[in-house]
Amino acid sequence: MKSAVENLSPTRVKLDVEVPFEELQPSIAEAYKTIAEQVQIPGFRKGKFPNRLIDQRVGRGYVLETAINEGLNGWYQNAVAETGLRPLSRPEVEITEVPDPAATDGELKFKVEVDVRPEVELPDYAGITVEVAPAEQSDEDRQKALDDLRGRFGTLKPADRPAAKDDFITIDINAKIADEDVDSATGLSYQVGAGTMLEGLDEAVEGLSTDEEAIFDTKLVGGEHAGEAAQVTVKLTAVKVRELPEADDDFAQLASEFDTIAELREDLVKQVNQSKTVEQGVEARDKVMEKLVELIEVPIPESVIEEQLEQHFDPANAHGEEDHDTEEHRVEVRENTERAFKNEIILDAVADKEEISVSQAELIDYIVNSASQYGMDPNQFAQMLDQSGQVPMVVSEVRRRKALAHVLGLATVTDTEGAAVDLSDFVKPAVDPELEAALNEAAGVTGEDDDTEAEEERVTVSADDPGAARF
């Protein structure tokens, strides 16, 4: 098989492929088997008759057409591997020449146009300089941390007064469209100001006393009338306030491992400091990424962006939002999509240059942390990723994070007061030693066999996921 590439643009190529007759033969043989299972010839068992009878029944041309249709994707994938292309989109195929069905020689020729990952030229990214806010904590930060902890142990007490922001209320609601009842619910619990129910609800209930009602106009967000304008009547049936426990030694013993409130406060100072340090690290990471994007020109394949936009604005994804597809929203989503594309291309290029790989321990550590964020069992989360074919995507994500951490480690980061910022915790993420030991034990890695060190198992999934061609 021969293949040649013509660059149409930095993100699009034309691939010319020639498949000699001898390489068509396996597909032709498979085509005969496929057709033999689909036709019936008197006097022969299904699938058990000579090829010449199939030629007589359906025609040699149909056999050749079937062979080409079944083999085309494989030849395309072979050409992609042979030329080192990294496709991003579905290929557009044009068959330009087929062998004469009556002949025993000839070539199959076809052309493919497809969007590919652009090549980028990396600058010297060592020593990128960025400035971030100081990791300082205030008295308000420390008090908020304590109050948040007290809130977790608070109790709700009835309040004999009108509802106010942050109160916990119980309500009944009824929705009407054109004076017709379309939905209702009773005994709903809600925190005033949360903004998690209907738009306009917070304003309607503030100031209401028990057994009072208010009427407001809004758009429904669920059910068969989602997105439709409705008139909603809300009745307040109870008001409660959260009563916080006293911040004393008893509370410290209840809410923590400490015996005194002084020890708890000291630990909260450490937690707030850690939180501020993380915020500072995130700011540095984001600014380093912004600098990379400024320094590196990344061509963007328009068709890939358009496909993602269409997926985002598919009516099935509107979730009842009438204003889901607006010009303003499209501009915002396009900008975010293009930014994400640039980030991926740049970080993949850095990972390639630095020969960054992903260890099994790093992959599972990422899965465990992600599962925790979703409140899922890590094993179930990993199984879900595997069944949905998302493991390569996760590997790529971890690899890009490591690439960005590498660049961040080479950067010069100072705060706005001129002090150097230590980002060692961000650029050298440590895998839990117990987790790594367990993984190695499960894999049979001991480091003692034949007096040689066992190398850490590495995930060898490709960072590319062009998908199979569909014609």
Curated annotation (Swiss-Prot):
Transmembrane recorded as keyword = no
Annotated region (Disordered), positions in chain: 442-471
E.C. number:
5.2.1.8
Q: Give the compositionally biased regions (Acidic residues).
A: 447-456
Where found in the cell? Cytoplasm
GO molecular function (one): peptidyl-prolyl cis-trans isomerase activity
Entry's InterPro entries? PPIase_dom_sf (IPR046357), Trig_fac (IPR005215), Trigger_fac_C (IPR008880), Trigger_fac_C_sf (IPR037041), Trigger_fac_ribosome-bd_bac (IPR008881), Trigger_fac_ribosome-bd_sf (IPR036611), Trigger_fact/SurA_dom_sf (IPR027304)
Function per UniProt: Involved in protein export. Acts as a chaperone by maintaining the newly synthesized protein in an open conformation. Functions as a peptidyl-prolyl cis-trans isomerase.
Per the record, the similarity remark reads: Belongs to the FKBP-type PPIase family. Tig subfamily.
| Descriptive protein name | Trigger factor
